[in-house]
């Protein structure tokens, strides 16, 4: 009984670790997946433009890993500067309130009312300034995240451009070509593989985008990530319609 209980205790931390693994995205696993995908593309279509796009996407994924670390880590210099600025402003407000006096024989209450009104205005403006200072770090991180997400959005469109002329209907029906028709040298199997690789690249692109909100809670960045996920899902659906035509 003791041996069984001991084995259960040993398995419990391992089970908890495995459960935790599947509740969060792992940037290293995404990079490994993309490396394998790039290798498959290079081996199947050496020297192709799609292989170069996969290489660029791998570079962006590695950059995303460092960006995610930056987004998740507190920026202590910024926080210290903001804290100091807030203390200075609060000290100024305290000094202004302390100077308000009710002077007998010199207007009294009217002067006090004016002083209180001025103090309230100062408090409102200082509150706005404090809010601005407290959101500096988030806005700086958001700017970096949105810049990186814009690159991912562009890559998704580039992948879509690569599959744009890959028309299975042209391959299956073999209509006469014109002077402006794209050169088609792929077999049915190669075209299916090419389209499948494009779909996989779009899927990985959306996963890289999701990394940016894994440990960075910002609604603006989350909205941008959702847009990329919707974009890649829509583009992937178009690709799978072509793959379905090939398999009919």
Regions found by a protein language model. Give the residues of each.
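Cytosol-/stroma-facing membrane-proximal "stalk/adaptor" domains immediately downstream
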Residues: 205-248
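Alpha-helical transmembrane segments and their immediate juxtamembrane boundary regions
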Residues: 66-140
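N-terminal amphipathic/basic-hydrophobic helices that include classical n-h-c signal peptides
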Residues: 1-20
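Solvent-exposed, non-transmembrane helices and loops of integral membrane proteins
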Residues: 47, 146-188, 244
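Mature extracytoplasmic or organellar-lumen-exposed domains after removal of signal/transit peptides
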Residues: 51-69, 96, 186, 193-212, ...
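Short, charged cytosolic
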Residues: 22-29, 37-65
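Amphipathic alpha-helix face/heptad-repeat signature
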Residues: 26, 30, 53, 119, ...
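Short, charged/polar, low-complexity loop and linker segments
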Residues: 36-41, 107, 127-136, 178-186, ...
């Amino acid at each position: 009984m003791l041996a069984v209980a001991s084995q259960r205790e040993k398995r419990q931390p391992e089970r908890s670790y495995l459960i935790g693994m599947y509740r969060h995205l792992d940037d290293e696993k995404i990079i490994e997946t993309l490396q394998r995908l790039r290798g498959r593309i290079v081996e199947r279509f050496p020297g192709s433009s799609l292989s170069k796009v996969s290489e660029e996407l791998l570079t962006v994924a590695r950059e995303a890993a460092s960006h995610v670390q930056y987004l998740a880590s507190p920026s202590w210099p910024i926080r210290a500067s903001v804290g100091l600025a807030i203390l200075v402003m609060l000290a100024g407000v305290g000094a202004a309130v302390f100077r308000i006096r009710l002077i007998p024989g010199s207007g009294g209450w009217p002067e006090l009312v004016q002083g209180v009104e001025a103090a309230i205005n100062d408090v409102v403006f200082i509150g706005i300034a404090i809010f601005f200072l407290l959101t500096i770090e988030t806005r700086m991180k958001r700017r970096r995240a949105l810049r990186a997400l814009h690159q991912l959005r562009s890559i998704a469109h580039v992948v879509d451009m690569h599959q744009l002329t890959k028309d299975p209907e042209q391959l299956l029906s073999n209509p006469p070509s014109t002077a402006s028709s794209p050169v088609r040298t792929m077999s049915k199997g190669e075209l299916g593989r090419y389209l499948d690789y494009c779909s996989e690249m779009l899927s990985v692109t959306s996963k890289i985008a999701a990394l940016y909100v894994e440990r960075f809670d910002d609604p603006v960045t989350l909205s941008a990530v959702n847009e990329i996920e919707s974009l890649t899902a829509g583009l992937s659906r178009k690709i799978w319609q072509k793959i379905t035509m090939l398999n009919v």
